[in-house]
Amino acid sequence: MHKHQHCCKCPECYEVTRLAALRRLEPPGYGDWQVPDPYGPSGGNGASSGYGGYSSQTLPSQAGATPTPRTKAKLIPTGRDVGPVPPKPVPGKSTPKLNGSGPGWWPECTCTNRDWYEQASPAPLLVNPEALEPSLSVNGSDGMFKYEEIVLERGNSGLGFSIAGGIDNPHVPDDPGIFITKIIPGGAAAMDGRLGVNDCVLRVNEVDVSEVVHSRAVEALKEAGPVVRLVVRRRQPPPETIMEVNLLKGPKGLGFSIAGGIGNQHIPGDNSIYITKIIEGGAAQKDGRLQIGDRLLAVNNTNLQDVRHEEAVASLKNTSDMVYLKVAKPGSIHLNDMYAPPDYASTFTALADNHISHNSSLGYLGAVESKVTYPAPPQVPPTRYSPIPRHMLAEEDFTREPRKIILHKGSTGLGFNIVGGEDGEGIFVSFILAGGPADLSGELRRGDRILSVNGVNLRNATHEQAAAALKRAGQSVTIVAQYRPEEYSRFESKIHDLREQMMNSSMSSGSGSLRTSEKRSLYVRALFDYDRTRDSCLPSQGLSFSYGDILHVINASDDEWWQARLVTPHGESEQIGVIPSKKRVEKKERARLKTVKFHARTGMIESNRDFPGLSDDYYGAKNLKGVTSNTSDSESSSKGQEDAILSYEPVTRQEIHYARPVIILGPMKDRVNDDLISEFPHKFGSCVPHTTRPRRDNEVDGQDYHFVVSREQMEKDIQDNKFIEAGQFNDNLYGTSIQSVRAVAERGKHCILDVSGNAIKRLQQAQLYPIAIFIKPKSIEALMEMNRRQTYEQANKIFDKAMKLEQEFGEYFTAIVQGDSLEEIYNKIKQIIEDQSGHYIWVPSPEKL
């Protein structure tokens, strides 16, 4: 039982302190307390100075224990410290006034017994805890909290995090706080690096969101402006325990799996090497001291801190039978703590592991650790807590009851994918798009079973019925979902089985990742985006790339996986990674998609097998476009043809002695073309078109137009493919000839061409390889923002036209450009042209993949 410490020995003060600690009351109104303003000198009462007024929910206590009152707190003047929460005033009692002067504050009692003041209990942690003495405990065994102020600058995609919780829908039992549920990769929060999942947001700028409804917190974040100041509360992780372990290798090697390292972080922002799996029957399990979540510091005399994944693998492989390990074990957290994660080891196991084995014939599978988790038999007794930081878990303690979720469609649809619908097995959420409506709401989860959409019962629906219901749902969609991870695991296990089969076949050669016999090397251009972090089946460290990137495939002998490195304008990258083979890309997509139809509204793909708008894997939307013939009507040209999956295009390096023509396609192309010629008249020019129209008096032949003597001659030249594009206006023919383009190119100028996508291939056939750049609008709203005179209908038409353009000619683009302003787009285009203006270029190769 805790001892109730108080500021003096008088009975009145003791009673106030005791009751403040024991009673759980509603939070006081602003102004009840005078608290130092965490953002500067106090200019008024508590309503505008600081974030006082939190109930005991802010610092939850262990069930059944009597919390220690917070009667003294020492404030170290750091300029941005947020003071601890004062005790709740007790009705009917004289309330101690908080003294805000001097370096600290304390309950000011009415007696003269100040001699006991220095014995009062310490305060909880404050902002900038590095300025304080360590190990300041909160409520005894309840753990420790840290308060931090974080200033974020709103980026192109917002603040880059998702929230959940509030008085109306608590994220944590008995806590109405607003919690961070996801940090979106590449967003403002991720780039800043300080905000973390499970942080509790207490204040947004000057708005107190500690106890508000969810919508109020969302509103505060939306209205916060370009620079947002957050005050957050988080658990202080218990200090690590350093342990030395000697392991004797057994038949299964060391018996554990690892993940992490520089360039392959297991936890964002952390280069450490983590133990992710204890193999049943292995040396580590028999020894009993290593656990999932332990951090490897050293192997024998080799330091494993801040090393690459491959270096850690090599250090573990190159050991004798007796191995010395130095590990850091996370501190223990009490089992009854409502904020703590469930027992990870008794509930989950990770998939794409790195099995350490001393058997040289088996090699080493240095896989990227998968973030996907699957149920597995318990590895430790359920009463034993596995001290994994909460952000390392794929599943939290989450309600299994049906939940009502309201989503509003955005430019990416609803932002999630579904699987299932066969033999009445149910419809499940399989993927949440980062930054999409589902992700930003924080309410829908992977593994949720969709029970209904806008009142339409989907409990026994087929996949097609569910996809149709979601497609017809309108802008505001009400979903009833139920978290069923056990049922969803059957779909995950299919991926797992596929990966295991692939790895077993790969091991037969002893290479550890790919079959190395008959190595085949080639260069390819990527026709889709690939994100290695979303591929749970990788047999080794993957290599991410974007559409248009040149890849040197150094080993294409394996049917499923290739080894490759990126080729940049400055040479080849040293990093080698695994990418999916052409066969794997095409097989995976054809198996998943019965038909592929371009979704012009969202710029994504639509299928009768998956929810429209998203891809359920690591492939970008670009690889799903159907290849069509050179015609402006992409839909009619693709009818009756089997859609081809765009994966890789074989290329070869070629030396050229001309300035490549430039074709800009998409919105704002005319403005970009004009600006290029105006700003760089010595680098860019235009060619002289041909026409059968009679010459006017003020026109010069060869300068204004090439005036063709007869229509028959021009028609013949068009039939002989001497023109890249031609058309008719007022019974006169107009066109751009290959020779006109070549004349500009051979003078050392980039010929700016205002033509359609059909001209790209015709120029390639004429050995004039253009720099073809597509300006891809981010959304209809983005178009309207860049041209405020446009109506929604006009912007919508432009957006649809751009999406159809990408569908039809995407495989011929040199690069795709996006931006939030014309200036940003223009600068990117200039850089691309500069990068592509060398004497050596990559051109399509006749080689077959």
Curated annotation (Swiss-Prot):
Residues 659-834 form the Guanylate kinase-like domain. Residues 149-235, 244-330, 404-484 form the PDZ domain. Residues 57-69 have a biased composition (Polar residues). Coiled coil: none annotated. Residues 519-589 form the SH3 domain. Interacts through its PDZ domains with NETO1, GRIN2B, SYNGAP1 and APC. Interacts through its first two PDZ domains with ERBB4. Interacts through its third PDZ domain with NLGN1, and probably with NLGN2 and NLGN3. Interacts through its guanylate kinase-like domain with DLGAP1, DLGAP2, DLGAP3 and DLGAP4. Interacts with FRMPD4 (via C-terminus). Interacts with LRFN1, LRFN2 and LRFN4. Interacts with FLTP. Interacts with GPR85. Interacts with DGKI (via PDZ-binding motif). It comes from the Eukaryota. The lineage of its organism: Eukaryota, Metazoa, Chordata, Craniata, Vertebrata. GO terms for molecular function: kinase binding; phosphatase binding; ubiquitin protein ligase binding. InterPro entries: DLG1-4_PDZ_assoc (IPR019583), DLG1-like (IPR016313), DLG1_PEST_dom (IPR019590), DLG3_SH3 (IPR035763), GK/Ca_channel_bsu (IPR008145), Guanylate_kin-like_dom (IPR008144), Guanylate_kinase_CS (IPR020590), P-loop_NTPase (IPR027417). The modification Phosphotyrosine is found at residue 705. One of its GO terms (cellular component) is cytoplasm. It holds the Pfam family PDZ. Residues 32-101 are annotated as: Disordered. Required for learning most likely through its role in synaptic plasticity following NMDA receptor signaling. Belongs to the MAGUK family. PANTHER family: DISCS LARGE, DISKS LARGE HOMOLOG 3. Residues 41-53 have a biased composition (Gly residues). GO terms for biological process: chemical synaptic transmission; establishment of planar polarity; establishment or maintenance of epithelial cell apical/basal polarity; regulation of postsynaptic membrane neurotransmitter receptor levels. Keywords: Phosphoprotein, Repeat, SH3 domain. This is Disks large homolog 3. The keyword Coiled coil does not apply. It comes from Mus musculus. The modification Phosphoserine is found at residue 157.
